[in-house]
Amino acid sequence: MNNFRNLINQSIRNYSTTTNVATKTKVYELKTYNILANNIPSFFELLGENKGSNSLGTWVTEMGSSNQVISLVEHESLDDRQMNEWNTKFQSKAAKLIEKQESLILREFPWAPFQKISNEKSNENKVWELRTYQSKPGKLGQWAIDFTTGFAERKKISEPVGVFYSEFGPLNTIVHLWPYKSFEDRFRIRDLALKNPVWVETVAKTTANLDSMESKTIIPVKL
């Protein structure tokens, strides 16, 4: 664990625009709900009625998986999550609508702090991409070091709202959340990024430390 933290800190030093290397105890919870198609409207209604102030966004899957609702929640700490009365009340009401649910507890990489999703950003970006990577055991820190070598170049084209790694749930998991104006906008931006030699080299280095990758396109939902 100490070696992992040392590698994360090294990735911070490599990323020249980062000034604050302190890591807070704040965590993010990525919730994935599998809902029967005819239950989705009722689930959205219930989610809207019980929306907590720490909810950062809700999406429904379009490609990659079907009938999934994705929710991102912020917790000042895991202890706050444990004491959150909303969590208990919502779960008891929603249980009959949910086939399966998963919860992934995430922390943000210090060089990619989460960017709040404003109404304007949500309205402008109709298509979002949730990218999930599984790093090889013991290679997450090295992945972070390699990724930061090209992240500044990639941000010149477009930025994710967050880059996270898992604390609880499947370990060695990396999560990116990218906003796009449309599907064509996504193709255009990714094609442009792959013409940048720095980013191409970064992709080659980072993929060497990964076991798997998954992409879901998700559509924002207004509750």
UniProtKB/Swiss-Prot annotation:
Q: Which domain of life is it from?
A: Eukaryota
Can you name a GO cellular component term? mitochondrion
Query: What GO terms in the biological process aspect are recorded for it?
Result: mitophagy
Alphabetized InterPro entries for the sequence: Dimeric_a/b-barrel, NIPSNAP, NipSnap_domain
What pairs make up the disulfide bonds? none
Family recorded in the similarity comment: Belongs to the NipSnap family.
Q: What protein name applies here?
A: Protein NipSnap homolog
Name its species: Dictyostelium discoideum
Q: Which gene carries the instructions for this protein?
A: nipsnap
